[in-house]
């Protein structure tokens, strides 16, 4: 039986150790910090942000964030088996709505990955947008299904969907 390990640490440290040991994976599921850069006056929000990221500055410029994400994807490439897939869940912030698109473009231009599919996650418990009350509530988030460009032909995305879970 295959063993499954979970590590609660910076993904770059985990991937470095995996590379050193020659470990490979078939699937990467990643939901990185969204680079929201949003200030909050609420004590609860500040406590939650501090507990979520010990050392990550979630307020980079779009260019810094794109480079950081692209570096992570270049490391994904080193640990991903042939025909492996990345599920990348990312969203757009209220104050930096372009960050997601700038980073996605950087991945597509600076790595050998491509978007094979996109899943739209309808969040059942989407909260009202109290950070910027003049913006729409974020009720969906994309999950990009990403594979290597040269492996797209073997990406089997056309199987019949047998069931779809209702989330909202």
Regions found by a protein language model. Give the residues of each.
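Core catalytic lobe of class I
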Residues: 2-168
